[in-house]
Structure formats: C-alpha cells, structure tokens
C-alpha cells in the first residue's frame, strides 16, 4: 500500500482541501474516486462527512477501499459513469449533498499499466476506464471510417492536420492493422517532426475521449449539477476542451439575468444566479507540485458555491 502512496499523487490536494474547508457535515460525493487520495485526505480532516465515491475502474475501487479502511462505515462506493451515478445520488440525497469533487485526470496507475494502453509504449490498444465497456481504442483506430476519425481528431484533439493523420492511419491499417499503442505511437512519430510535444499526444487524447465518452459525460454532469443546493462544486480539468465546458457552465450558473440576448430590457427580475464562482481564474499547481509530479502541470481547478 505504501507503494501506491508513493506512486499516485493526488493533484492539487491542498487546494482541494482548502476549497472544501467550510464543510462539516453532510454528504460528499467524489465523482472520480480513483485510488481515493482526495477522499482519504478529506475524511481525515472531516470525519463527520459521509462519502459517496464513484468510479468506473473496478481495480481502482479495490485499491481505494484498502486506502479508506480506517473510515469503514463512513463511505459507500458506486461503480459506473459519474454522470449517471451522480444523478442517482442527487435524487436520493438532495440537499444533504454539501460537496462534490470531479477530478478528470487519468491516474498514474492507469497510465503506467502497459495492459491498459494509455501510454505510448503499451503493448495493448485499449484506453477503457471501464474494462466492461465494448468500445476500445483498437476498435476506434482499426475500424472507424475516415470521416469519423477526422471528426474525433478535430473535435477532441484540436489537431490541425486531422485530415492528413486520418488518411495516413486508414492507409496504413489497410496493409496492417495497428496491434498496440506502441505500434500506433511509432507510426504517428514517423509522420511528424514536432519536437514540442510527442506527435501521438493529441491523437491519444482524442481516442481516449471517444472511447470513454469523456466530454459527453462531463456535459451531462454539469447539466444535473445545476440542481445542487448549498453545495460546493470543485472540478479539476486537464485540457482546454474540459476546462472550457466547466468555465462556461459556471458562468451560466452565476448568471442573474436569463433573458434572451436580443431583449432590450431585462424582464426576468435579474435574480436567477444559482450561486457564485469562487475562482475568478482557475487554480493551477505550484512549481513545487509540478517538480514532484509532472503530470499535474496541465491541471486547472475551478470552484463554485451554490446557494441554499
């Protein structure tokens, strides 16, 4: 277990604890429990909270249970996608929910596991958070039509040469299907001379988002989160697509006027804000944290306080 403590470093841990410092009692939902790092630290400080942890990854759940042993009876783990499970928890617990955390990153345990296919050197081409899901990276890269590949590379990777990359992938797989992540990564490296970032980075991001429905799930969650009352919502994102969704959702939550933009005059009474944004700019990791955990460098945390 000490090996897990050393391997997995919860991103922006102190900042998360600070965000939820006002909490004393009630239900806390960790929508992306992972290995339980954030939840363990929070329960250590707030023993009167009741934790609901949600995760798709059953292996991660087992590790989280082991790490949360000291809090037996204070937590409950739900398996599945966080949008669906959060909606169910919201219907059950309503205004008892006082805090919600969403950490959209992939854990080091998943990234470093060669059998999961998340890293460039994996001898697998999978990328599923939920290993019971039917769609995996191999199906995407070896069977999606060129138009579908272009769309996910453009929409989920913001790749400038999305047409060219999709064309080369389809051309190559016709001769020999991609067998693992290393095979795909090496092929992508042969197409690009970009030295700033690994040529496979954005393609892998796009495929992972597609396989796990990451943006759709985040959109669904943010829509349901509007129903929270008196709760603190904290979301940690790791790329601009996620952060833009969170930023825009929080702006909409904080809007007083909901009149049509074409209206010359407000007729809605101008008091529809659901709460306030507590982070005018996103909180990012300190240089010290990045030094000890390079994977934290792209993290951005936004916090919203809902009115009772």
UniProtKB/Swiss-Prot annotation:
Enzyme class (EC, first level): transferase
Matching InterPro entries: RsmH (IPR002903), SAM-dep_MeTrfase_MraW_recog (IPR023397), SAM-dependent_MTases_sf (IPR029063)
GO cellular component annotations of the record: cytoplasm
Pfam families in UniProt: Methyltransf_5
Gene3D superfamilies: Putative methyltransferase TM0872, insert domain, Vaccinia Virus protein VP39
Keywords: Cytoplasm, Methyltransferase, rRNA processing, S-adenosyl-L-methionine, Transferase
Compartment(s) of residence: Cytoplasm
Binding-site positions, S-adenosyl-L-methionine: 36-38, 55, 86, 103, 110
Keyword Ligase: no
The keyword Transferase appears for this protein: yes
Gene Ontology BP terms: rRNA base methylation
Annotated catalysed reactions: cytidine(1402) in 16S rRNA + S-adenosyl-L-methionine = N(4)-methylcytidine(1402) in 16S rRNA + S-adenosyl-L-homocysteine + H(+)
Main location: cytoplasm
E.C. code: 2.1.1.199
Molecular function (Gene Ontology), one example: rRNA (cytosine-N4-)-methyltransferase activity
NCBIfam families: 16S rRNA (cytosine(1402)-N(4))-methyltransferase RsmH (TIGR00006)
Biological role stated in the UniProt entry: Specifically methylates the N4 position of cytidine in position 1402 (C1402) of 16S rRNA.
Annotated family: Belongs to the methyltransferase superfamily. RsmH family.
Name of the protein described by the UniProt record: Ribosomal RNA small subunit methyltransferase H
Record organism: Helicobacter acinonychis (strain Sheeba)
Lineage: Bacteria, Pseudomonadati, Campylobacterota, Epsilonproteobacteria, Campylobacterales
